[in-house]
């Protein structure tokens, strides 16, 4: 019950926001499965229209950002919440940001792709909210930084990636670029090329 009171109940516009059972169950199931299986395992939560998907995403993002393993180290370095539509991005940003008011915990990427690159490489933000369309530009920025010898990269970091509307956002060039950025494949490839040229 303390987890429910401390992690799920939220006051918004003078009213108390309380999870419905399916929302609470979804978040708890993802957290339990992550403890059991660790990072790197795909999970799927399905919601019908109007069932509070944005709140479930927000609660899940915050729960995963606070998750620590048996060694007390965070299981994920960052949680990246991705949507494929700008209109939904604004709504989702407001929902996720509304649950935690600790400065620097959440970064809303609503400007340039450089902002996303900085948030992924930096240490401040625990939850990053962005659109899928920004990742192809981040690959280019990372490659340019690596070529100039200024690459910080994300190699060795663990990301929890929450994709809104996964059925429409998990294929194509943008997703390939997302995987390159978050797995460090592109940075590693660029460094290999630079070493070969030296």
Which residue ranges define each predicted feature?
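Signature of the SF2 helicase/ATPase Hel1-core->accessory helical subdomain module
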Residues: 132-198
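Conserved catalytic network of the ASCE P-loop NTPase/AAA+ motor domain
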Residues: 72-74, 120-123, 151-155, 184
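ATP-dependent helicase/translocase motor core
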Residues: 1-79, 83, 87, 91-103, ...
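Conserved motor-coupling elements within RecA-like helicase/translocase cores
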Residues: 112-128
């Amino acid at each position: 019950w303390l987890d429910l009171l401390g992690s799920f109940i939220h006051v918004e516009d003078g009213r108390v926001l309380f999870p419905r059972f399916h929302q609470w169950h979804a978040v708890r199931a993802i957290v339990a499965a992550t403890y059991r299986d660790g990072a790197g395992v795909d999970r799927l939560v399905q919601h019908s229209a109007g069932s509070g998907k944005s709140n479930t995403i927000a609660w899940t993002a915050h729960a995963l950002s606070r998750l620590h393993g048996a060694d007390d180290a965070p299981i994920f370095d960052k949680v990246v919440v991705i949507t494929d539509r700008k209109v939904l991005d604004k709504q989702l940003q407001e929902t996720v940001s509304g649950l935690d008011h600790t400065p620097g915990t959440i970064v809303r990427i609503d400007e340039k792709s450089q902002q996303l690159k900085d948030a992924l490489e930096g240490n401040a933000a625990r939850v990053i909210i962005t659109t899928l369309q920004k990742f192809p530009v981040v690959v280019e920025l990372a490659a340019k930084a690596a070529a100039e010898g200024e690459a910080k990269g994300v190699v060795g970091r663990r990301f929890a990636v929450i994709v809104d509307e996964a059925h429409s956002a998990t294929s194509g060039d943008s997703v390939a670029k997302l995987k390159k950025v978050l797995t460090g494949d592109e940075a590693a490839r660029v460094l290999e090329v630079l070493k070969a040229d030296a």
